[in-house]
Amino acid sequence: MAGKLRKSHIPGVSIWQLVEEIPEGCSTPDFEQKPVTSALPEGKNAVFRAVVCGEPRPEVRWQNSKGDLSDSSKYKISSSPGSKEHVLQINKLTGEDTDLYRCTAVNAYGEAACSVRLTVIEVGFRKNRKRHREPQEDLRKELMDFRKLLKKRAPPAPKKKMDLEQIWQLLMTADRKDYEKICLKYGIVDYRGMLRRLQEMKKEQEDKMAQYINTISSLRHIRVTKDGNAKFDLELDLKDSQSKIYLYKDGEMIPYGFNNQTKHCLRRLGKRYEFQIQDLRPEDSGIYQVKVEDAVVFSTELEASAIPPRVVVPLAETHCEEQGDAVFECTLSSPCPSAAWHFRHRLLHPSDKYEVYVSPDGLTHRLVVRGARFSDMGPYSLGTGLYTSSAWLVVEAGKDKDLQSTSADHKLQSRRSGKDGRLDIYGERRDATRSSTSRYKPGTGSFSKDAQGPMGHFSQGLADMEVQPGEAATLSCTLTSDLGPGTWFKDGVKLTTQDGVIFKQDGLVHSLFITHVQGTQAGRYTFVAGDQQSEATLTVQDSPTIAPDVTEKLREPLVVKAGKPVIVKIPFQSHLPIQAAWRKDGAEVVGSSDREAQVDLGDGYTRLCLPSAGRKDCGQYSVTLRSEGGSVQAELTLQVIDKPDPPQGPMEVQDCHRAGVCLRWRPPRDNGGRTVECYVVERRQAGRSTWLKVGEAPADSTTFTDAHVEPGRKYTFRVRAVTSEGAGEALESEEILVAPEALPKAPSAPAILSASSQGITLTWTAPRGPGSAHILGYLIERRKKGSNTWTAVNDQPVPERRWTVADVRQGCQYEFRVTAVAPSGPGEPGPPSDAVFARDPMRPPGLVRNLQVTDRSNTSITLSWAGPDTQEGDEAQGYVVELCSSDSLQWLPCHVGTVPVTTYTAKGLRPGEGYFVRVTAVNEGGQSQPSALDTLVQAMPVTVCPKFLVDSSTKDLLTVKVGDTVRVPVSFEAMPMPEVTWLKDGLPLPKRSVTVTKDGLTQLLIPVAGLSDSGLYTVVLRTLQGKEVAHSFRIRVAACPQAPGPIHLQENVPGTVTAEWEPSPDEAQDVPLHYAVFTRSSAHGPWHEAADRIHTNRFTLLGILPGHEYHFRVVAKNELGASKPSDTSQPWCIPRQRDRFTVKAPCYREPDLSQKPRFLVGLRSHLLPQGCECCMSCAVQGSPRPHVTWFKNDRSLEGNPAVYSTDLLGVCSLTIPSVSPKDSGEYKAVAENTLGQAVSTATLIVIEPST
């Protein structure tokens, strides 16, 4: 049966349309109500009701797996006239009636069918009754054998052990939201430790990456595309474009290419690097790393669960007889819970008709089609999302027409390599010659073919073909014997000559001709002859087409203005699914945001949208439309016009002096798509905000000269390129100063050649530098010494550089200066000359007198002398000091110029070297004869006898307290340095005493003074000649005195009291001491000094008053301090004699002052930092006087050594010397007496210091 399958609005109902077109008012059969599955006990009657519809009224038939229900005593089929309801009643149910019952409604236009299962519940001994169930038993046995076969699969591959270093690299580039998942996957339990280590590793990695990379951004982890490929990408800004990039998988480097022909490929676009993994398989899972040289820059993981399952064992074509069961089986590379079965692109759901099985490992999927009919014939497929495996079910007619019971020989058909006539997992069509005698042998795990029967078979089957639309196609096959004319089918539908095909038979060769192939004629063609059949696929390469007028329009460049949107819509025609790929200058156009390019593919068109066109969008665009039938490409040129870029700089600005300012620039990098017409030049004066247009330069010139500038002013220039779109951005220069015409520089100071009372002759040198090339002459000026007024000597410039000034006054002192004159004007005056007298030349001075050496050192000699005897006109104006070494005959001056005074120190001499010295007087008339010393002077200090520098502040006796540090400096002078020796009591110093001598100072240091350090210390200075000088002083080391002994009081004279005490034990020592006596009149009163500096052991206090108590205290003192006091044990008191008198006390009743405790001032809370002292106080009142007890957190603090409390006249205090956090808490003071108690509480909070 051939036809077209349609859907029903009731699930479980299949409708097969037998004709191409149904006349108006007619329809195929359908069910309004299908029978309901029932489970009834044995002996009951089963009733199935079906309500059918259709025009003309369909005929209803009931069947089961055994055939017709012709036994009228067992089966009763009825329907009411005019009613759509049809009833099947099964009487007296037995276990044999358990079966699948099928209701079929048929009319002239189609067939509708549904199935229902009846289950008979047996009771008693009938449960164990053996029934005839060969087909079911065979099916069950086959399924069990198949399950055993699945259990024999190899154990799963062991899980790959990942390198811990790779896991850390993966964490460094992973998103923070994925940290927890990665840690759980690889068993990292210390999450905080992981974060700390990750931070350290990131710093190390950044330092390492900084050697090769400027920046890295836009990291996108690995993802699987719809094409079954995986890709990941990142943006890298390499410091060196020649740096090598490596790709690693699980720590091993893998090669990659640059096109889609390799397993791993790299695509680069600018700074973006995209890695692709083609043809994903389970073994491709793992951690991928990208390295630049030896630095890891990116890590990502491809999980096995992300790899789409592939078809390992595809579906095989299945043959079964009508009403038989057909089995399809497919094995995947990995479990796929979402795998779905389809029949003619219709999703199949598990039901009584279709049973779906999945092996325990989730790899093998099986579909069982129960009760196959001709309407079930067609392609069945299993889809996993990316991959699909398809095969045909061929339903063959049974051996008799009565629908006899069929054995469930739904055996699996063998899949012949290259001849199974179906799509393999790579989508390639293969030819097949399939015989219905192929059978699957259970338990063998392989396929075989039964022996051929005596009938003919195909010696050459149909072959797959691919043709273009409009071409002719021929499908032919050859039989070994004549099996009749045969029948041609297309997609299961019988073909006739009315379908536009031509059938031919030439002997045993059967052919099908199509003169002009159309896209609708593509499909699966089958030729059936007898029980033999051959199939092939005719593919029409219906490539997409673009209208010629559209192509013609695209040849013209598309011109738009910058900032405007660009929308390019290209319509096309195609009967197959289309993929559109846009490219710009060979690079793929991919848009990811509203500001970038957007590519859209609609129904019959593809569109490229640029929201805001820019100059970077200019270029050659192409779009490739690709389908299974072929591809077509269209190209267009996009031109975006805009204002030009600024001219390229920097702008060269040159001051051409009298010609003006010359500007030079380079043409703009981008002219905006239009030719530059001219350049506009503007300038702005410093301090102003207005730009002034100064001119235009032609397009072929990039120079301009502005002659209208003022010297001495600052200007800024800018240049714009101008096109038909307008003026572009400006190139601005730096600020330039237009320099005025250069004036000559100043000449040097004039030199005096000669001077007399008649005139002074000068000479000078010409100036150098800008403006000094053309000197017209020189102006000479003079002034008197001490005056500020310069007077011109000449009115006209002097061309020579020598001049004699004659207008001078004899005896006056003059200074001169010169100014150069050029065509641009006079320059700056030069510096003045030295002062010179207008007088006749002087006579040389006389000899220097009284030359002598006043001081010497190792490197210097100081001289002094007296001036020569003078007469009028020969006074000395300076002196020249010269030295001559003892090993040389040459006199060398010690200074530059002359010495104006009569003393000089020659420095920088060699120690111990001998020198001859001479001095010469100098004036304007010349030099005098030199005056020299007769003896050789050595550069060495003058001998000074040792002497101590002792003054009135120097002490001969030093008293020091025990334990103090002693420092005794002694100053002296001597030359050369003498030998210094320290002695104590005439003997060398002990080792713990330290002496230091340097630069005329020697010092004694005793770090810790003891009583043994007392004594006479002597410093001895001994010269090289053995002469000695000594200085002595005494050091007394003492301690504070000990306390005096007990004090005894007695009254020797009435009205006085005499205090005597035993002397201090230190009184017998050399240190003098004295005593001080103090008294007070009460036990708590202050002490008053009664006497001081008492050198005896007795003191008498006068003015004793009867009835007063007197307490005495004695303290021993010396110059180092006072001793501890010695007090009287009992005070001194003289009884007061009183006269007797009688007092009559008044009688009164004393009031009752009893009162229970109450707090006048309560405790308050404290907030203190750690380590501070805390004092809590309160005031309590009560009679009898209450007793106060302190508590902390309801625990008594009595006996706690860390705190102490006081109670003074009702003011109670609790003191904690140094609080700590453990002292925080609630404190309570409880006051109690015989009448009651009172409580006051407060809180103490101790703040810990922040770390």
Curated annotation (Swiss-Prot):
Q: What tissues express this gene product?
A: Expressed in skeletal muscle.
**Mind telling me which Pfam families this protein's record contains?**
fn3, I-set, THB
Gene3D superfamilies given in the database record: Immunoglobulins
Which segments carry the region annotation Disordered? 61-81, 403-454
The answer to whether keyword Zinc applies is no
In terms of SUPFAM superfamilies, this protein maps to: Fibronectin type III, Immunoglobulin
Q: Could you tell me which residue ranges the Fibronectin type-III domain spans?
A: 646-741, 746-845, 847-942, 1043-1137
Q: Where is the composition biased (Basic and acidic residues)?
A: 403-433
Coiled-coil region list: 188-221
Q: Where in the cell is it found?
A: Nucleus; Cytoplasm, Myofibril, Sarcomere, Z line
Q: Which residues lie in Polar residues bias regions? A: 434-449
Q: Look up keyword Nucleus and say if it applies.
A: yes
Instruction: Pinpoint the Ig-like domain residues.
Output: 29-119, 309-398, 454-539, 946-1030, 1151-1245
Q: Which GO terms describe its cellular component?
A: nucleus; Z disc
User: What PROSITE patterns does the record point to?
Assistant: FN3 (PS50853), IG_LIKE (PS50835)
| Alphabetically ordered keywords of this record | Coiled coil, Cytoplasm, Immunoglobulin domain, Nucleus, Repeat
Its subunit composition reads: Interacts with FLNC. Interacts with KY.
Q: What is this protein called?
A: Immunoglobulin-like and fibronectin type III domain-containing protein 1
Which organism is this entry from? Homo sapiens (Human)
